[in-house]
Every structure is written in C-alpha cells, then in structure tokens.
C-alpha cells in the first residue's frame, strides 16, 4: 500500500492512496474525497496533485478534464452517450456519478467533456492488467 504525504507549514496529511476516490478542483484549492465519504479541502491546486500522483508507483490516478482526477480503481462505468462517469466499488457506500456538459445535475458541480471521457475509456481499454477488461 502506498501512502500520500502532503505537508504544509502548519500540518501534515497522510492518507493511503487506496482510500482516495477522487480529487476535484475548487479555485485555488482542491477537495480530496475519500472512500469513507469525507472530503478534505487542501491548499493546493489540482496540478499539484497531478504531479504528485504521477510520482507514485501504483499509477492509479488519471486526470479527467480540467477539474477532476480519479482513482482508476473506482471507475465503474464510462458512458459516452450519456456523458457519464460512475465511480463505485471497494469501500464506497454509494456510487458517485459525474455528468457531462449537457447535464447540469451533477451533485459534484463538475462537468465532463465527451472528449475527456472518450480519452479515459481508450486509456482503460488499452491498459494491460489483471482485470480482464
């Protein structure tokens, strides 16, 4: 299990990467959402997490558009027609649904582009792994 350590001048946050479901942009901050449903506001922009996740050995995080980085472990459905991304599985109690630009009902206030979802789908289809899919 890999751990993510984020240090600021006033605190150190240490979290297992398996417990991170997604990180979303919120202006100059980012919200890290964990499997237990809790969200932690971090004083870093999303590009900081993008760089940190790229340095991890497990390669489990992927950026989906300008506002969102998701843990690939929790990707359940990518639906290009509905422009929908559903995260589920693991320790998540309920699925998390992100909608495309044509649907403003996303509870996470993030809209995903069709192109971003298409790239994510292709990335996962071309990955070599043990998931038979």
Model-derived features: positions:
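Basic, polyanion-interacting recognition surfaces, primarily
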Residues: 1-133
């Amino acid at each position: 299990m890999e751990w993510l350590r984020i240090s600021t001048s006033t605190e150190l946050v240490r979290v297992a990467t398996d417990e991170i479901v997604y990180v979303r942009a919120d202006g100059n901050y980012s919200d890290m959402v964990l499997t237990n449903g809790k969200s932690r506001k971090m004083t870093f922009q999303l590009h900081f997490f993008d760089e940190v996740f790229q340095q991890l050995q497990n390669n489990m995080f992927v950026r989906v558009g300008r506002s969102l980085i998701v843990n690939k472990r929790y990707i359940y459905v990518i639906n290009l027609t509905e422009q929908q991304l559903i995260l589920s599985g693991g320790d998540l109690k309920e699925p998390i649904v992100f909608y495309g630009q044509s649907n403003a009902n996303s509870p996470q206030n993030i809209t995903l582009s069709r192109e971003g979802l298409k790239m994510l789908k292709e990335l996962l289809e071309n990955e070599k792994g043990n998931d038979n899919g």
